[in-house]
A protein has these predicted regions:
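Alpha-helical linker/hinge and terminal dimerization helices associated
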Residues: 87, 116-127
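C-terminal regulatory/oligomerization modules of transcriptional regulators
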Residues: 1-21, 125-188
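Short, Lys/Arg-enriched N-terminal segment that forms or immediately precedes the first helix
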Residues: 19-41
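Basic, amphipathic "hinge/linker" alpha-helix immediately C-terminal to the N-terminal HTH DNA-binding motif
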Residues: 45, 96-119
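Canonical helix-turn-helix DNA-binding module
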Residues: 63, 67-95, 99
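Short aromatic/hydrophobic contact patches that present stacked aromatics
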Residues: 69, 103-105, 137-139
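Short histidine
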Residues: 23, 31, 49, 53, ...
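N-terminal helix-turn-helix DNA-binding core of bacterial DNA-binding proteins
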Residues: 35-76
Length: 188
């Protein structure tokens, strides 16, 4: 019990140091890590955020459309869209002056998440639903075959798997917290 209380107090202290954690409802503190995956999760790791992105790739641009499709609370949707805009994943564009309304479009940074979402969908189809039972599958328009994403080396074109890679750590990179603080400061 004492260990639980100590861990809880440490988390509360780290949330005080990094208010973004409390805002995002995080239960773990990745802010001191130097990790691209942890940093990415801070931007797009929330389930609502991933579903917002999924729908953006399907052409949804307006707040009301997301709310209707997802059934998400207005305050949650507004917070997720604000985070995506602050991180440059989406851009808010005014489409009506009276009443003032805006729509949200993917930036290049947001469009660069396409392979991530396609890979997640493929993984879910194969490992959650089971092969051949997925909710949605993608067909390559050019060849007409069902699409399954694979990673390839940009330099040589070889299809790769995790075991084909060597991890190189950059010791002088910023922590996740430093990166988040810089983005949130710049977006104010």
């Amino acid at each position: 019990m004492l260990l639980f209380i100590l861990k809880r107090n440490a988390l509360l202290l780290s949330r005080a140091e990094h208010p973004n954690l409390a805002r995002m409802g995080r239960t773990a503190d990745y802010t001191k890590e130097r990790c691209s995956i942890a940093a990415t999760l801070e931007v797009v790791g929330d389930p609502w955020t991933l579903l917002i992105l999924r729908d953006a790739f399907a052409g949804v641009k307006r707040f009301e459309q997301w709310q209707e499709r997802l059934g998400v609370a207005r305050n949650v949707l507004a917070a997720r869209l604000k985070t995506l805009v602050a991180h440059g994943v989406m851009e808010a564009q005014r489409y009506s002056e009276r009443p003032p309304r805006q729509e949200y479009v993917l930036t290049q940074k947001g469009r660069d998440l396409s392979p991530v979402l396609l890979t997640m969908a493929d993984w879910g189809d194969r490992h959650v639903y089971g092969a051949g039972n997925g909710a949605v599958h993608f067909v390559h328009k050019t060849c007409g075959h069902e699409f399954h994403p694979r990673l390839a080396c940009e330099a040589c074109g070889e299809v790769i798997e995790g075991r084909d890679l060597k991890r190189v750590v950059h010791d002088n990179c910023q922590t996740v917290g430093e990166v988040l603080d810089a983005v949130m400061t710049a977006s104010k």
